């Protein structure tokens, strides 16, 4: 068995004295592990950092075997990313989200979004916007997507400012007013048709994380006996600190 694909390194762990098991998110083969000979050595260390993009050749005698990777760096961005505190937390959080996906199942849309985030990680606001949308995409990919296209109560497509925590559906201002204390705010940049828009300040970003965080925790993480990673909280805090620093300047 053999295939060639593009991949993003999610993590590594030592295997024996000299080798490493490397976990990739690949474009066409999903989340996939393989053994890298010599991967525990210092020569390979710069290549095998989370967030780097690689060209991967995987070989195994049978498809169900762990197999071996031959990797070649195509975009070695990890060293630059890790100079930003939000990026260091962010890549760890993204890797944790990717591990929610079943192994060896293609998720090419998720791969494309993941790579796009890595290219914009130097700007904390842009990175945070991408990460909120990535969490939305993960909910969709795992079968728990939110329906933000129209009001669950009236069917209207305008003035959608709330989300029902029970149904995950949008609610309009007028329909939601009597129950606004029980509803979640829907940031404008997450509304249907606003895919290219930016958050309106830090509050919008934080409301986005609150929204996705609640549904990820309830529908995905808690049923698996998991909680949000510390890296997620670290990323959100680092983004908030960067906003304070920029405002002070």
Curated annotation (Swiss-Prot):
GO terms for cellular component: bacterial nucleoid. Coiled coil: none annotated. InterPro entries: ARFGAP/RecO (IPR037278), DNA_rep/recomb_RecO_N (IPR022572), NA-bd_OB-fold (IPR012340), RecO (IPR003717), RecO_C (IPR042242). Keywords: DNA damage, DNA recombination, DNA repair. Pfam families: RecO_C, RecO_N. Belongs to the RecO family. PANTHER family: DNA REPAIR PROTEIN RECO (PTHR33991:SF1). This is DNA repair protein RecO. It comes from Afipia carboxidovorans (strain ATCC 49405 / DSM 1227 / KCTC 32145 / OM5).
């Amino acid at each position: 068995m053999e295939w060639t694909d593009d991949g993003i390194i999610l993590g590594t762990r030592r295997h024996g004295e000299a080798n490493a098991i490397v976990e990739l998110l690949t474009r066409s083969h999903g989340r996939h592990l393989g053994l890298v000979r010599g991967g525990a050595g210092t020569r390979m260390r710069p290549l095998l950092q989370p967030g780097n993009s690689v060209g991967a050749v995987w070989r195994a005698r049978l498809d169900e075997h762990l197999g071996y990777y031959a990797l070649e760096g195509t975009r070695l961005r990890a060293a630059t990313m890790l100079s930003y505190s939000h990026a260091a937390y962010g890549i760890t959080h993204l890797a944790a989200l990717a591990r929610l996906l079943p192994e060896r199942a293609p998720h090419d849309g998720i791969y494309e979004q993941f790579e796009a985030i890595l290219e914009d990680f130097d700007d904390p606001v842009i990175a945070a916007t991408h990460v909120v949308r990535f969490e939305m995409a993960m909910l969709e990919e795992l079968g728990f997507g939110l329906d933000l296209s129209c009001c669950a109560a009236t069917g209207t497509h305008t003035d959608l400012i709330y989300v029902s925590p029970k149904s995950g559906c949008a609610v309009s201002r007028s329909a939601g007013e009597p129950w606004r204390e029980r509803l979640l705010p829907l940031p404008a940049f997450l509304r249907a048709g606003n895919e290219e828009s930016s958050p309106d300040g830090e509050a919008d970003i934080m409301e986005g994380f609150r929204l996705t965080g609640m549904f990820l925790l309830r529908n995905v993480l808690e049923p698996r006996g998991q909680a949000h990673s510390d890296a997620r909280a670290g990323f959100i805090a680092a983004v908030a600190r960067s906003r304070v620093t920029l405002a002070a300047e």
